[in-house]
Amino acid sequence: MSNEVERVYPRLLDFVRKKYVSKNLLRVTLTGEDLIGFPEDQNGSHIKVFFPNQASGILQLPIREGDKVIWPEHKPVPRAYTVRQYRAQSNELDIDFVVHGEGTPGGGWALKAQTGSQLGLIGPGGPDPLIEPADWHIMAGDLSAVPAISAILEKMPSQAKGYVFLEVDDIEDKHDISHPEQMVIKWLVRDPNQAQPVLAMAIEQLPVPQGAESLSAFVAGENESVIACRKILRNEYRIARDKIYAIPYWKRGKNEEAYHEERHVVMDEEF
């Protein structure tokens, strides 16, 4: 997440309601006085969310004093998420959470959230646009990337062309997504016994579009999958580095704290 985002004072937000988008994707709607003035037209952008301290269950947000960040006694748990939708008229913000149980800070909070539940937020940030203008687009991601990809598709021009590959562990996570007619969406169910990342295989088998003078791509999700996809996009499709936004959200076997620095190394690598 950019330095610009990290300079924004944390907002304290209140739970409003929640609903399932699919079997393992839960949408939580938030509001609050601190949300007033949240930037519009930032659907799909990155945000950093602060959850209650896991030991005490107390939510205390950090404060800034000059160039210093002062952390409270009950340090909150930070995680990166996506703005699914912000509605200024009702002052409501939607965040979609991947939920596989109560063991993770974000998914666990979303499952338990009820009237009176709160979280902190800074942002939004990240590149704008999230996918560069081009004649043809390639988008790929797992369930954690579906909120961002859905938001991007909603903002794309109606004449946009390309392919979208969405990887899920459970076919019941397949759901309708609004998209330009010529952006073809393909849902892929991951085989845990398959060695090669399913998204990379799908991109590799995709025929290079005829007559397209420019290509752009957006890839997000698990670390190894993002790296594999990016290599193919750079080495086989010859898409320019500045036309690819590839961001690993997570790494299998590691939590956010253990993976944070490695993520930035991966994002800065050249292929």
UniProtKB/Swiss-Prot annotation:
Entry annotated with the keyword NAD: yes
Cofactor field: FAD
Pfam family, one: FAD_binding_9
Record's catalysed reaction(s): 2 a Fe(II)-siderophore + NAD(+) + H(+) = 2 a Fe(III)-siderophore + NADH
Annotated keywords: Cytoplasm, FAD, Flavoprotein, NAD, Oxidoreductase
GO CC terms, sorted: cytoplasm
Function description: Ferric-siderophore reductase involved in iron removal from the siderophores after their transport into the cell. Involved in intracellular removal of iron from iron-vibriobactin complex. Vibriobactin is an iron-chelating compound involved in the transport of iron from the bacterial environment into the cell cytoplasm. Ferric-vibriobactin reductase catalyzing the reduction of Fe(3+)-vibriobactin, a catecholate siderophore synthesized by V.cholerae.
Protein name per Swiss-Prot or TrEMBL: Ferric vibriobactin reductase ViuB
Species name: Vibrio cholerae serotype O1 (strain ATCC 39315 / El Tor Inaba N16961)
